[in-house]
Protein backbone atom coordinates (compact mmCIF):
# COMPACT_ATOMS: atom_id res chain seq x y z
CA UNK A 1 0.00 0.00 0.00
CA UNK A 2 1.38 3.49 -0.84
CA UNK A 3 2.88 5.31 2.12
CA UNK A 4 0.62 8.31 1.65
CA UNK A 5 -2.49 6.15 1.85
CA UNK A 6 -1.39 4.48 5.06
CA UNK A 7 -0.61 7.85 6.64
CA UNK A 8 -4.27 8.84 6.41
CA UNK A 9 -5.44 5.95 8.53
CA UNK A 10 -2.58 6.53 10.91
CA UNK A 11 -3.65 10.15 11.32
CA UNK A 12 -6.75 9.03 13.16
CA UNK A 13 -4.64 6.73 15.29
CA UNK A 14 -2.43 9.68 16.21
CA UNK A 15 -5.43 11.58 17.47
CA UNK A 16 -6.67 8.56 19.39
CA UNK A 17 -3.38 8.29 21.25
CA UNK A 18 -3.14 12.04 21.79
CA UNK A 19 -6.61 12.16 23.34
CA UNK A 20 -5.76 9.32 25.70
CA UNK A 21 -2.59 11.05 26.91
CA UNK A 22 -3.72 14.67 26.85
CA UNK A 23 -7.25 14.87 28.25
CA UNK A 24 -6.33 18.17 29.92
CA UNK A 25 -5.78 19.85 26.59
CA UNK A 26 -9.53 20.05 25.84
CA UNK A 27 -10.36 20.70 22.22
CA UNK A 28 -7.49 20.94 19.80
CA UNK A 29 -7.40 21.35 16.07
CA UNK A 30 -6.60 18.06 14.42
CA UNK A 31 -4.26 18.21 11.44
CA UNK A 32 -5.99 18.32 8.11
CA UNK A 33 -5.65 15.17 6.08
CA UNK A 34 -2.73 14.85 3.74
CA UNK A 35 -3.35 16.62 0.47
CA UNK A 36 -6.34 18.50 1.85
CA UNK A 37 -6.66 22.20 2.61
CA UNK A 38 -8.17 23.66 5.77
CA UNK A 39 -10.81 25.43 3.72
CA UNK A 40 -11.99 22.19 2.14
CA UNK A 41 -12.24 20.53 5.54
CA UNK A 42 -14.25 23.44 6.94
CA UNK A 43 -16.49 23.38 3.89
CA UNK A 44 -17.28 19.74 4.52
CA UNK A 45 -18.02 20.25 8.17
CA UNK A 46 -20.03 23.44 7.93
CA UNK A 47 -21.20 24.23 11.47
CA UNK A 48 -19.51 21.55 13.50
CA UNK A 49 -20.25 20.57 17.10
CA UNK A 50 -18.53 22.27 19.98
CA UNK A 51 -14.88 21.42 20.63
CA UNK A 52 -14.46 19.15 17.62
CA UNK A 53 -11.46 18.98 15.31
CA UNK A 54 -11.99 20.45 11.87
CA UNK A 55 -11.02 17.18 10.21
CA UNK A 56 -11.10 13.61 11.40
CA UNK A 57 -9.21 11.46 8.98
CA UNK A 58 -10.23 7.95 8.12
CA UNK A 59 -8.74 5.98 5.28
CA UNK A 60 -10.53 3.30 3.32
CA UNK A 61 -7.73 0.96 2.20
CA UNK A 62 -6.81 1.46 -1.42
CA UNK A 63 -6.95 -2.26 -2.10
CA UNK A 64 -10.69 -2.16 -1.46
CA UNK A 65 -11.56 1.36 -2.45
CA UNK A 66 -9.62 1.91 -5.66
CA UNK A 67 -9.33 5.66 -5.15
CA UNK A 68 -7.57 8.03 -2.77
CA UNK A 69 -9.38 8.87 0.44
CA UNK A 70 -9.10 11.89 2.67
CA UNK A 71 -11.77 12.96 5.13
CA UNK A 72 -14.72 10.65 5.58
CA UNK A 73 -17.00 13.09 7.38
CA UNK A 74 -20.57 14.29 7.05
CA UNK A 75 -21.27 17.99 6.90
CA UNK A 76 -23.76 19.10 9.54
CA UNK A 77 -25.29 22.13 7.82
CA UNK A 78 -28.63 22.44 9.61
CA UNK A 79 -27.53 20.88 12.90
CA UNK A 80 -25.71 23.80 14.43
CA UNK A 81 -24.03 23.47 17.77
CA UNK A 82 -24.16 25.76 20.75
CA UNK A 83 -21.25 27.91 21.89
CA UNK A 84 -18.95 27.04 19.02
CA UNK A 85 -15.44 28.19 19.51
CA UNK A 86 -12.19 27.38 17.78
CA UNK A 87 -9.01 26.65 19.68
CA UNK A 88 -6.33 29.28 19.28
CA UNK A 89 -3.27 28.77 17.13
CA UNK A 90 -1.01 27.92 20.07
CA UNK A 91 -3.35 25.15 21.15
CA UNK A 92 -3.42 23.83 17.59
CA UNK A 93 0.36 23.67 17.41
CA UNK A 94 0.60 22.08 20.84
CA UNK A 95 -2.08 19.54 19.97
CA UNK A 96 -0.39 18.61 16.70
CA UNK A 97 3.02 18.18 18.32
CA UNK A 98 1.56 16.08 21.15
CA UNK A 99 -0.21 13.91 18.58
CA UNK A 100 3.00 13.35 16.65
CA UNK A 101 4.81 12.40 19.85
CA UNK A 102 1.95 10.09 20.80
CA UNK A 103 2.15 8.32 17.44
CA UNK A 104 5.88 7.77 17.81
CA UNK A 105 5.36 6.34 21.32
CA UNK A 106 2.37 4.14 20.47
CA UNK A 107 3.45 0.92 18.73
CA UNK A 108 -0.11 -0.39 18.87
CA UNK A 109 -1.22 2.14 16.26
CA UNK A 110 0.74 0.32 13.57
CA UNK A 111 -0.90 -2.93 14.63
CA UNK A 112 -4.33 -1.28 14.37
CA UNK A 113 -3.63 -0.15 10.81
CA UNK A 114 -2.35 -3.59 9.85
CA UNK A 115 -5.35 -5.31 11.42
CA UNK A 116 -7.78 -3.09 9.48
CA UNK A 117 -6.20 -4.23 6.22
CA UNK A 118 -6.06 -7.85 7.35
CA UNK A 119 -9.77 -7.90 8.26
CA UNK A 120 -10.85 -6.29 5.01
CA UNK A 121 -8.70 -8.68 3.00
CA UNK A 122 -10.39 -11.55 4.81
CA UNK A 123 -13.75 -10.08 3.86
CA UNK A 124 -12.70 -9.57 0.24
CA UNK A 125 -11.53 -13.19 -0.04
CA UNK A 126 -14.61 -14.45 1.88
CA UNK A 127 -12.37 -16.21 4.38
CA UNK A 128 -13.36 -16.85 8.01
CA UNK A 129 -12.08 -14.39 10.59
CA UNK A 130 -10.62 -15.94 13.72
CA UNK A 131 -8.84 -14.60 16.76
CA UNK A 132 -6.06 -17.10 16.15
CA UNK A 133 -5.35 -15.78 12.67
CA UNK A 134 -5.41 -12.17 13.86
CA UNK A 135 -2.83 -12.95 16.53
CA UNK A 136 -0.72 -15.18 14.28
CA UNK A 137 -0.51 -12.91 11.24
CA UNK A 138 -0.89 -9.39 12.66
CA UNK A 139 -0.77 -8.91 16.42
CA UNK A 140 1.86 -11.52 17.25
CA UNK A 141 3.89 -10.55 20.33
CA UNK A 142 1.35 -7.87 21.27
CA UNK A 143 -1.38 -10.46 21.93
CA UNK A 144 -1.75 -9.07 25.44
CA UNK A 145 -3.26 -5.98 23.79
CA UNK A 146 -5.53 -7.98 21.49
CA UNK A 147 -8.79 -6.52 22.78
CA UNK A 148 -7.62 -2.91 22.48
CA UNK A 149 -6.17 -3.39 19.00
CA UNK A 150 -9.29 -5.17 17.77
CA UNK A 151 -11.56 -2.51 19.26
CA UNK A 152 -9.71 0.32 17.55
CA UNK A 153 -9.52 -1.51 14.21
CA UNK A 154 -13.23 -2.30 14.40
CA UNK A 155 -14.02 1.38 14.95
CA UNK A 156 -12.19 2.31 11.75
CA UNK A 157 -14.11 -0.29 9.75
CA UNK A 158 -17.39 0.75 11.35
CA UNK A 159 -16.93 4.37 10.30
CA UNK A 160 -15.79 3.48 6.80
CA UNK A 161 -18.36 0.82 5.96
CA UNK A 162 -21.16 1.13 8.52
CA UNK A 163 -20.69 -2.37 9.89
CA UNK A 164 -19.78 -3.91 13.24
CA UNK A 165 -17.33 -6.75 13.70
CA UNK A 166 -18.81 -9.18 16.22
CA UNK A 167 -17.73 -12.46 17.74
CA UNK A 168 -20.17 -15.12 16.51
CA UNK A 169 -18.54 -18.16 18.12
CA UNK A 170 -17.14 -17.44 21.61
CA UNK A 171 -15.69 -20.94 21.89
CA UNK A 172 -13.69 -21.02 18.64
CA UNK A 173 -13.47 -17.20 18.54
CA UNK A 174 -14.91 -16.66 15.08
CA UNK A 175 -15.89 -13.15 13.99
CA UNK A 176 -18.21 -11.78 11.30
CA UNK A 177 -19.39 -8.44 9.93
CA UNK A 178 -22.92 -7.18 10.60
CA UNK A 179 -24.74 -4.11 9.33
CA UNK A 180 -24.76 -1.39 11.98
CA UNK A 181 -28.31 -0.33 11.23
CA UNK A 182 -31.42 -2.49 10.99
CA UNK A 183 -31.33 -2.32 7.21
CA UNK A 184 -32.51 -5.25 5.10
CA UNK A 185 -30.49 -3.80 2.23
CA UNK A 186 -27.92 -6.50 2.98
CA UNK A 187 -30.45 -9.15 1.98
CA UNK A 188 -30.98 -7.64 -1.47
CA UNK A 189 -27.31 -7.55 -2.44
CA UNK A 190 -24.60 -10.09 -3.02
CA UNK A 191 -21.97 -10.82 -0.39
CA UNK A 192 -19.48 -8.95 -2.53
CA UNK A 193 -21.52 -5.76 -2.35
CA UNK A 194 -22.96 -5.98 1.14
CA UNK A 195 -20.50 -4.11 3.34
CA UNK A 196 -19.35 -1.22 1.16
CA UNK A 197 -22.77 -0.27 -0.20
CA UNK A 198 -24.37 -0.40 3.22
CA UNK A 199 -21.74 2.08 4.37
CA UNK A 200 -22.42 4.26 1.35
CA UNK A 201 -26.13 4.25 2.17
CA UNK A 202 -25.54 5.12 5.81
CA UNK A 203 -23.41 8.09 4.87
CA UNK A 204 -26.01 9.26 2.37
CA UNK A 205 -28.73 9.04 5.03
CA UNK A 206 -26.51 11.00 7.39
CA UNK A 207 -25.84 13.75 4.87
CA UNK A 208 -29.57 14.07 4.19
CA UNK A 209 -30.52 14.25 7.86
CA UNK A 210 -27.76 16.71 8.72
CA UNK A 211 -28.87 18.96 5.88
CA UNK A 212 -32.44 19.39 7.06
CA UNK A 213 -33.85 16.07 5.79
CA UNK A 214 -33.33 17.01 2.13
CA UNK A 215 -29.83 17.28 0.73
CA UNK A 216 -28.94 18.97 -2.56
CA UNK A 217 -27.33 16.49 -4.92
CA UNK A 218 -24.15 18.54 -5.01
CA UNK A 219 -23.84 18.38 -1.21
CA UNK A 220 -24.09 14.59 -1.25
CA UNK A 221 -21.51 14.22 -4.00
CA UNK A 222 -19.20 16.64 -2.22
CA UNK A 223 -18.99 14.22 0.67
CA UNK A 224 -18.71 11.21 -1.63
CA UNK A 225 -15.88 12.89 -3.55
CA UNK A 226 -13.92 13.25 -0.35
CA UNK A 227 -14.29 9.50 0.10
CA UNK A 228 -12.89 8.94 -3.38
CA UNK A 229 -16.32 8.19 -4.87
CA UNK A 230 -17.23 10.25 -7.94
CA UNK A 231 -20.48 10.36 -9.89
CA UNK A 232 -18.74 10.16 -13.26
CA UNK A 233 -16.07 7.57 -12.43
CA UNK A 234 -16.40 3.81 -12.15
CA UNK A 235 -15.53 2.68 -8.65
CA UNK A 236 -13.68 -0.51 -7.79
CA UNK A 237 -16.41 -1.68 -5.41
CA UNK A 238 -19.45 0.49 -6.05
CA UNK A 239 -19.34 0.18 -9.84
CA UNK A 240 -21.30 3.14 -11.19
CA UNK A 241 -21.79 5.36 -8.10
CA UNK A 242 -24.36 7.59 -9.80
CA UNK A 243 -26.46 4.54 -10.70
CA UNK A 244 -26.19 3.20 -7.15
CA UNK A 245 -27.31 6.51 -5.64
CA UNK A 246 -29.94 7.66 -8.13
CA UNK A 247 -31.37 4.32 -9.31
CA UNK A 248 -30.47 1.27 -7.23
CA UNK A 249 -31.09 2.78 -3.80
CA UNK A 250 -34.10 4.65 -5.16
CA UNK A 251 -35.65 1.47 -6.59
CA UNK A 252 -35.06 -0.24 -3.25
CA UNK A 253 -36.88 2.73 -1.65
CA UNK A 254 -34.01 3.67 0.65
CA UNK A 255 -33.57 7.03 -1.07
CA UNK A 256 -35.74 9.45 -2.98
CA UNK A 257 -34.19 11.44 -5.81
CA UNK A 258 -36.24 14.30 -7.16
CA UNK A 259 -36.01 17.64 -8.90
CA UNK A 260 -35.96 20.67 -6.64
CA UNK A 261 -39.30 22.45 -7.18
CA UNK A 262 -39.14 25.49 -9.46
CA UNK A 263 -35.40 25.05 -10.07
CA UNK A 264 -34.22 26.46 -13.38
CA UNK A 265 -31.91 25.07 -14.59
CA UNK A 266 -33.11 21.82 -12.98
CA UNK A 267 -31.41 20.84 -9.74
CA UNK A 268 -31.92 17.62 -7.82
CA UNK A 269 -32.00 16.56 -4.20
CA UNK A 270 -31.96 13.40 -2.07
CA UNK A 271 -34.40 12.49 0.69
CA UNK A 272 -34.86 9.42 2.87
CA UNK A 273 -37.03 6.81 1.20
CA UNK A 274 -39.89 5.00 2.97
CA UNK A 275 -37.78 1.91 3.55
CA UNK A 276 -35.09 3.94 5.33
CA UNK A 277 -37.76 5.47 7.58
CA UNK A 278 -39.09 1.99 8.35
CA UNK A 279 -35.79 0.21 8.95
CA UNK A 280 -33.71 2.78 10.80
CA UNK A 281 -34.19 6.01 12.73
CA UNK A 282 -32.81 9.51 12.90
CA UNK A 283 -31.26 8.74 16.27
CA UNK A 284 -29.35 5.73 14.93
CA UNK A 285 -28.06 7.74 11.99
CA UNK A 286 -27.15 10.65 14.28
CA UNK A 287 -25.25 8.26 16.54
CA UNK A 288 -23.28 7.09 13.51
CA UNK A 289 -22.57 10.68 12.45
CA UNK A 290 -21.53 11.62 15.99
CA UNK A 291 -19.13 8.71 16.10
CA UNK A 292 -17.58 9.88 12.85
CA UNK A 293 -16.96 13.21 14.57
CA UNK A 294 -15.71 11.44 17.70
CA UNK A 295 -18.42 12.99 19.85
CA UNK A 296 -21.95 12.31 21.14
CA UNK A 297 -25.32 12.97 19.44
CA UNK A 298 -26.16 15.81 21.84
CA UNK A 299 -23.24 17.78 20.38
CA UNK A 300 -25.64 18.57 17.53
CA UNK A 301 -28.47 20.15 19.56
CA UNK A 302 -31.06 20.82 16.86
CA UNK A 303 -30.64 17.43 15.20
CA UNK A 304 -30.55 15.72 18.59
CA UNK A 305 -33.86 17.30 19.57
CA UNK A 306 -35.37 16.26 16.26
CA UNK A 307 -34.08 12.72 16.72
CA UNK A 308 -35.56 12.59 20.24
CA UNK A 309 -38.94 13.70 18.89
CA UNK A 310 -38.69 11.02 16.22
CA UNK A 311 -37.94 8.39 18.86
CA UNK A 312 -40.96 9.51 20.90
CA UNK A 313 -43.24 9.36 17.86
CA UNK A 314 -41.96 5.89 16.99
CA UNK A 315 -42.57 4.71 20.56
CA UNK A 316 -46.12 6.07 20.47
CA UNK A 317 -46.72 4.38 17.12
CA UNK A 318 -45.51 1.05 18.53
CA UNK A 319 -47.82 1.37 21.54
CA UNK A 320 -50.75 2.21 19.27
CA UNK A 321 -49.94 -0.72 16.99
CA UNK A 322 -49.79 -3.14 19.93
CA UNK A 323 -53.09 -1.80 21.27
CA UNK A 324 -54.69 -2.22 17.85
CA UNK A 325 -53.37 -5.76 17.56
CA UNK A 326 -54.67 -6.63 21.03
CA UNK A 327 -58.08 -5.14 20.25
CA UNK A 328 -58.32 -7.12 17.02
CA UNK A 329 -57.33 -10.31 18.83
CA UNK A 330 -59.97 -9.72 21.50
CA UNK A 331 -62.60 -9.04 18.84
CA UNK A 332 -61.74 -12.28 17.04
CA UNK A 333 -61.84 -14.16 20.32
CA UNK A 334 -65.28 -12.81 21.15
CA UNK A 335 -66.53 -13.63 17.66
CA UNK A 336 -65.21 -17.17 17.92
CA UNK A 337 -66.76 -17.64 21.36
CA UNK A 338 -70.09 -16.30 20.14
CA UNK A 339 -70.09 -18.61 17.12
CA UNK A 340 -69.26 -21.58 19.32
CA UNK A 341 -72.13 -20.75 21.70
CA UNK A 342 -74.63 -20.49 18.86
CA UNK A 343 -73.43 -23.79 17.46
CA UNK A 344 -74.32 -25.46 20.73
From Swiss-Prot:
Biased composition (Polar residues): 67-88, 335-344
GO cellular component: cytoplasm; nucleus
Bias-annotated ranges (Basic and acidic residues): 89-101
Extent of Low complexity compositional bias: 324-334
Keywords assigned by UniProt, alphabetized: Cytoplasm, Tumor antigen, Ubl conjugation pathway
Superkingdom in the source lineage: Eukaryota
Main subcellular location of this protein, as a coarse class: cytoplasm
GO annotation terms (biological process): negative regulation of transcription by RNA polymerase II
Region feature Disordered, mapped onto this chain: 1-50, 66-103, 324-344
Subunit structure: Interacts with LNX1.
Listed name of the protein: Melanoma-associated antigen B18
Source species: Macaca fascicularis
Gene encoding the protein: MAGEB18
Amino acid sequence: MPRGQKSKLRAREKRHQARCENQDLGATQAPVAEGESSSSANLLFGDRPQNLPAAETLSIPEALQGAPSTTNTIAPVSCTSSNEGASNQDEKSLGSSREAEGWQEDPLSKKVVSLVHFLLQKYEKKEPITKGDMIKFVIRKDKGHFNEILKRASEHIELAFGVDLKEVDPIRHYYAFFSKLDLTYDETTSDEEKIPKTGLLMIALGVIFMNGNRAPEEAVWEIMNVMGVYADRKHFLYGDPRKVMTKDLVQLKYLEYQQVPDSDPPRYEFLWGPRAHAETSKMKVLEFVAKMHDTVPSAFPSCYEEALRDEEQRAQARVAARAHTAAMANARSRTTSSSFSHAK
